[in-house]
Design a protein with these regions (language model features):
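NAD(P)-binding Rossmann-fold cofactor-contacting core
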Residues: 1-18
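Aromatic-residue-lined binding/catalytic grooves and analogous aromatic/hydrophobic interfacial grooves
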Residues: 147
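Small-residue helix-packing motif on alpha-helices
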Residues: 4, 14, 32, 168-175
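Conserved beta-strand segments of alpha/beta enzyme cores
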Residues: 3, 22-24, 85, 127
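Mobile acidic interaction elements
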Residues: 6-7, 11, 25, 124, ...
Length: 177
């Protein structure tokens, strides 16, 4: 954590993140980009354009840009960042508890060492699956991205139904799981 810089335009949120996890904090995306070996873009797709514009021209040659933004294609990332060493990834919701699977792909500029870094970073959320063609990213997003949330929602509804029928919540959970 002492080598990680979190960039957030909201100082209170960024400072809290820094204090909670022992990270360095900056409000400047360009400052983070200039210092990064690996720059993780973990923002909503609708703000990605603004974020990419703020780092364009600030990335060091050979640094890795790792995107976790849904639906943002590698060409868009490369053009927007002015950089070619790009990984696009799509984690799913169970990754929040380390039980997910993240599908990822990268450009030919990504070195073997950077591929290993990617596996290590994304592996913190569970399993990883590398695909060599970006077309599989969109397919995986449809299949895997939010799909598990619907399964959990259905499980919660079944548990509620069990409670409604007279089971304790604990017993209903055991029956459903």
């Amino acid at each position: 954590p002492d080598r990680i810089i979190a960039a957030d335009p909201h100082e209170d949120r960024g400072r809290q993140l820094g204090e909670s996890y022992g990270l360095h904090f900056t409000r400047s995306n360009s400052e983070a980009a200039e210092a990064a070996d690996v720059l993780v873009l973990s923002v909503k797709p609708q703000v990605m354009g603004k974020v990419m514009a703020s780092i364009k021209g600030h990335l060091r040659p050979g640094s890795l840009v790792l995107s976790i933004a849904a639906g943002v294609r590698i060409k868009v990332l490369s053009d927007g960042c002015g950089h070619n060493c790009i990984v696009r990834s799509m984690p799913n919701t169970p990754g929040q508890i380390g039980q997910g699977i993240t599908v990822w792909t990268g450009t030919s500029d990504v070195s073997d060492e950077q591929r290993q870094w990617t596996e290590d970073i994304l592996g913190a959320m569970g399993e990883t699956l590398y695909v060599d063609d970006e077309k599989f990213m969109d397919m995986a997003t449809a299949l895997n991205g939010s799909g598990p949330s619907y399964v959990f929602l259905l499980m919660e509804a079944l548990i509620d139904a069990g409670v409604h029928l007279g089971f304790s919540r604990q017993d209903a959970q055991r029956l459903v799981q």
